Amino acid sequence: MTTAVPAITSVSAAPAPGARLKMHREGPVLVLTLSNPTARNAINPSVYRAAAKAMRATSGFRTVRAIVLCGEGEHFSGGGDLRRLARQRKLPASEQHGHIGALHEWIMAIQEAPQPVIAAVEGAAMGGGFSLSLACDLIVAAEDAKFAMSYVNVGLSPDGGGTDSLVRALPPQAALEMLLDGTACTAGRLYELGVVNKVVPHGEACATALAWAQQLARGPFEVQARIKQLVYSARGRSRREQLEAERESFLASLYGDESGERIKEFLSPRKKQETSEEGPAT
């Protein structure tokens, strides 16, 4: 069932001519759609700010249990608006500094959201569009989708966390190949590398991502948030520090309401019967 987004519809505005962020609810799932189809859903600072605001607002709604990010029409996002950047060169660097900061606030809002965030990629995910998809927790891509760190092709270094995301996911050599070469990479190749989670037929990325989000939305909200936090903070910790973080998270989960309800359900006679009928797990 499609419903309006409660209490946060004000951030779904038309930020600038040709570039919009659309939002709607599908039950417990919030769907954010990049809408600028005539320009392959190019994004700009107004979209960055609207999206970051939406993400931060959504973090406070436990009724929103998962988030899907997609593009309108045939593409996910071609990245930043090069015409705007060409004009920006005539203005002080301090102004562009603020614009990039807005993009990076959006990236951090995705990472810090308690809900799982799934990118649904059709067509092109280029430059900032690729960085944006990588910032999401999970990626569903159409089999003919193309991804490229195309910044280098126009004499730019990446933003939007692209370097960080690739180095977290890949060996340095593979990351540098994408960053220095700038050519398109297929969804299948990224799936083989472990960057893309699911590859689906053309036109089915959003529907598949939404179905996955609906499944995740049935999971334990607070535990999923803790898992995200553990994963994203692991690289900056020693093994001992991560083990301590896991212990604290486990204890918080064990004594929380979510585990109490789910453990009780799992140990119920009915659940035992279902498990017995399914056979041993090993």
Please report, for each region that a protein language model flagged, where it lies by residue.
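Hydrophobic alpha-helical membrane-association signature
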Residues: 47-51, 99-102, 132, 246
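Glycine- (often His-adjacent) and acidic-residue-rich active-site loop
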Residues: 63, 71-109, 125, 153-155, ...
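Crotonase-fold acyl-CoA enzyme core
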Residues: 108-222, 256
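Conserved CoA-thioester-binding segment of acyl-CoA-metabolizing enzymes
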Residues: 1-72, 94, 108, 282
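Charged catalytic carboxylate motif
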Residues: 46, 50, 102, 109, ...
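Hydrophobic/aromatic residues within transmembrane alpha-helices
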Residues: 32, 69, 81, 132-134, ...
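C-terminal alpha-helix plus adjacent terminal tail
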Residues: 1-30, 182-188, 206-207, 211-282
